[in-house]
Curated annotation (Swiss-Prot):
It holds the Pfam family Slx4. Disulfide bonds: none annotated. Residues 352-362, 621-633 have a biased composition (Basic residues). This is Structure-specific endonuclease subunit slx4. Keywords: DNA damage, DNA recombination, DNA repair, Nucleus, Phosphoprotein.
Amino acid sequence: MSAAADVIVLSSSPDRIPNGSPVLPAHDPAKLFDLSPPSASSSPVRSPSELFQISTRSRFFELETPSRNKENKTPKEPPVRKVNTTSKAKSASSQDKPKRRGRKPASESQTVLGDSGLAGLAQQSAPKKTAGARKKRVDSEGKRGKATNRTIMGRVAKSGNVQAKPPQEKIMDVSTPNALPPTKPASGVVSLEIDGLQLETAMKRRIDWTPTKDTTARTVESSQQEVAEANPQSFGSLLSEYGFNDISSAQSDVRNLGDDGPTKRRRIELVDSRLFGSSKPASHDIDDKNLTEDSQQKQPEPKQKPKKQTKKFTTLTARVTASYLNNSHEGSDSSSKETTTSRENAATSRTRGSKRKGKATSKPKEPEFIVLSPEAAAKSLENQELIFGTCSQLEREDSPTSLKELQAAISESERYAVAEPSPLSSTLCATPTSRFTTARGLWSVAARDLEGSLIRQTEVVDLVDTPEPAKMTTSTNDSRNEKALEDAATVPPKEPFDLPKSEPPKLKAIPAAKKEPSPAPGMPTIKASDNLKGTTSQHSKPQPKMPNYNGFTDAELSRQVASYGFKPVKNRKAMIDLLQKCWVSKHGKGTTFETQAGSQNTSTEPTPVLTSSEPNTSQKQPRKTATSRKTAAKSKTNPDSNPPPKINSRKTPSSSDATKAPSIQSKPTQPPPIQSLSNVEEIEDSEEETLPSPFRIQNRYTPQPPETRQALPVSKTLYSPSRPKPRTTKSTTNNSATLNQKQPDLADQIFKAMHAQPAGTPSRPSWHEKILMYDPIILEDFATWLNTEGLGLVGEDREVSAAFLRKWCESRGICCCYR
């Protein structure tokens, strides 16, 4: 029994024994069975080892089976094991290690006793072994046998050593199926009472994770039912509480959710995202009157805050916007008050409350329209809002019809300009020059069309009453030319200096008519006006006459083709045919016959052609001021086409006297046309000086003044058939000389020709594209292109050499090379 006493002492004092405790079990399996320690052995190895371990460790299991059958104490001990398995968790492995060190020596000391053969001590120390040593060995065997279950259960909770033992229950069920199932409910009750605080807290923690979700789900279901019952109430409260009910609603949410303690913040976030609409009606149903009183106490507070801020405003913008801020706060406060009253009522009354909101917002606007007393009106003027902006903007806001009036005025001006837009602009622009002394304000200067014509002078012009634009232009020309003739009788030299300020086409008409009546101011004015009237009356019929494109140079033909929007054509005949077709399609077919009749009648009387050619061109050029090429082309055809009707108009005074009388001044009817002839020639000389770029038709008559002066006393019909043909030859030579003298620089012409070339393809780029891509330009190819095609696009007849192109390229930094 001394050894047994030693065993009891060792089990009660585990602190000294761990020094010698690892030595005994380390020798036992090595000496007796030559086996590794049981922790490293696998589960199939245990079945043979248990046969050999009867004397040491397996003896206790064998002793238990008869003790269970014989004694009543033993069935109470394994349920203690089951209670430990069901109640405790595995996570406190740190607590297991000191217990193993304290309780393993007891088992090892018992093995020593087993060697001595004391079986009675095992039965006497059975309650101690069941409480201390047997529990730990069951734990160690459970850990050795099923480590996977131990690791899985250990991660869930680490408060106790108990969760390593539910797998042991299954093992014990396999070994002893009859004894275990009836003992489970009793063991569960005993374990809750024995184990104490740790078990209770662990069970609550395991229950809290799932049932808390169930509790929240129940609140959600109840709140959803309430929402389903009171949807209009919640919707109205949501709309009404956007303004100032955020504080009260947030506090109500905190009140509903403040019972759960540590998870306040999380549940507030969930309520804000999911249950925002449902929590409010629940809180209103619980605390109807209390919340309305709280909201009424809290809602006047935001009224006071903006009032304090309005007193602190010092800036101009703050003062201007203060009224709007007050109105917005008042509107929101009134709406919040109505929502609090609507919460007390039923759903129908709440919908009516929403209608009352709209009425309440409209009610403060009604007294603004009431007629005020003079004092109140003066006060309202003092409190009037400041409006920033220019007066022009305010005028346009006050007069919305100004745009309509302006559009109507523009449309009226466009009606006159539909057929011929240029004559209107020319006449309107000519009015300030003829009335140069009139005062001109900024408005008169600024009120102009896109073409530069004055908008407001459409009403001032005397010709507004005339319905047709053609008649209007003729009447303007007649009235102005008559005034100009009357002025020219008094001061002839000053008018040409004043008139160039207007458009250049007017230069030809007015001075030509002004210098006619210089010797006899009375009678010639009538004839000049008659001539002008004859020409203007004829403009309706012979105005669109086809020019003689055969007399044009290649450069002029190319310009005409380009003006119609066609690409340049190399062949001269093709260009002439194309221009004729374009002109016929634009002006009509009936005019071509007039050109033929005019060309046949030119042989009868060429000298009056000189008299009438300039006024005709002057009347036509303002109509075609868009392009100077067309004016030149039409002025060329005037000597061939215009004379026959004018000869008929002038045959009454001068047909009998021109052939018979050699002297010019024999009769009073004849001198004005003769003097007009000489004056017209002088005007042509002056035009050469004023016009910077003379055309072929204008230069055609430059060598004529001496010839015509010599031919004037002679009969007019003698030189008519032979005169026009040599003129064309001389004019071509003289024209080429003058063009060569006044042609622009050839380098600029090359640059223009290069830009005039149409865009090429990626395989064959244009010369300009090659230069942009820094491709080396072969001088010979570039020269051949310029001489054959390029310079013809610009109307240049000169040719270019490769050496000149090399200088041109080097001066502009263009990469070039010879072939």
